[in-house]
């Protein structure tokens, strides 16, 4: 350890060991593997829901314009979200709200995250990846499968874990028409990650607890980045925590903005 360096805190990581950090820079465009919006239209769950307008792609473009206005700059993320039909991942009764910047219920007390939160977290996770990279990614909390579909546009391989069996089944149903060959859904305990496919270049979590589980740290590869919500005991709310593993194995942690996610739980139901 060089002079002036402070020793890295031990895990489980807590927020009193983390200092704030600013937003990361953008990266150039990485085009999707296939025109997913066409596949979803041709092979998905029917026609555009009533009320979305003559073309849901126009509604999607307005969503992307809002994301850009709010500071999302990574063209890879915007292209991936352009390709994924969010209305196909929510209940028909809520489809008219699919492209609003709001979270929506998906059952069992769970929600699909706001588009701005999805974009921000993925942008943070990919900030260390060079242009043209196809990283290996781990998602904790598949939910309805929407974020997994966005990640599959960007990655060489995505492993997505869901602990609630009905949601796991729903995600499989939602994703099946899109026919991703690089996406694996796993029914299991997200707190333990998925060691068989580790190490990962990026790990992203859609649930937050009081600490960052040690298995996630262990499964993060050199040059990788983990982005997850975590409880801030001082405020009682959640904030985004980013953990980078440098090529030499050292970990660097930073604290970002306040968020609101469902609690991170162990086991399966």
Curated annotation (Swiss-Prot):
InterPro entries: PCMT (IPR000682), SAM-dependent_MTases_sf (IPR029063). It comes from the Bacteria. The keyword Zinc-finger does not apply. The active site is at residue 113. It catalyses: [protein]-L-isoaspartate + S-adenosyl-L-methionine = [protein]-L-isoaspartate alpha-methyl ester + S-adenosyl-L-homocysteine. One of its GO terms (cellular component) is cytoplasm. Residues 1-53 are annotated as: Disordered. Its EC number is 2.1.1.77. Catalyzes the methyl esterification of L-isoaspartyl residues in peptides and proteins that result from spontaneous decomposition of normal L-aspartyl and L-asparaginyl residues. It plays a role in the repair and/or degradation of damaged proteins. PANTHER family: PROTEIN-L-ISOASPARTATE O-METHYLTRANSFERASE, PROTEIN-L-ISOASPARTATE(D-ASPARTATE) O-METHYLTRANSFERASE. Belongs to the methyltransferase superfamily. L-isoaspartyl/D-aspartyl protein methyltransferase family. This is Protein-L-isoaspartate O-methyltransferase. The lineage of its organism: Bacteria, Pseudomonadati, Pseudomonadota, Betaproteobacteria, Burkholderiales. The gene is pcm.
């Amino acid at each position: 350890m060089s002079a002036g360096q402070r020793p890295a805190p031990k895990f489980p990581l807590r927020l009193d060991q983390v200092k704030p950090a600013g937003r990361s820079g953008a990266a150039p465009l990485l085009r999707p593997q296939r025109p997913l919006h066409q596949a979803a239209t041709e092979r998905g769950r029917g026609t555009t829901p009533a009320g979305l307008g003559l073309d849901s792609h126009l509604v999607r473009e307005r969503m992307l314009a809002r994301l850009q206005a709010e500071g999302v700059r990574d063209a890879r993320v915007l292209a991936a979200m352009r390709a994924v039909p969010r209305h196909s991942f929510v209940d028909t009764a809520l489809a008219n709200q699919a492209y609003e910047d709001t979270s929506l219920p998906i059952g069992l007390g769970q929600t699909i995250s706001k588009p701005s939160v999805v974009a921000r977290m993925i942008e943070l996770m990919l900030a260390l990846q060079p242009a043209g990279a196809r990283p290996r990614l781990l998602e904790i909390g598949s939910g309805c499968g929407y974020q997994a579909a966005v990640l599959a546009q960007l990655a060489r391989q995505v492993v997505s874990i869901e602990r609630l069996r009905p949601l796991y089944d729903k995600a499989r149903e939602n994703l099946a028409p899109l026919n991703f060959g690089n996406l694996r859904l796993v029914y299991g305990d997200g707190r333990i990650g998925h060691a068989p496919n580790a190490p990962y270049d990026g790990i992203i979590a859609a649930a937050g607890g009081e600490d960052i589980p040690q298995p996630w740290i262990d499964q993060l590869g050199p040059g990788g980045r983990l982005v997850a919500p975590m409880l801030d005991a001082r405020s009682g709310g959640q904030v985004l925590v980013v953990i980078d593993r440098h090529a030499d194995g050292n970990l660097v942690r930073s604290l970002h903005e306040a968020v609101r996610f469902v609690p991170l739980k162990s086991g399966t139901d």
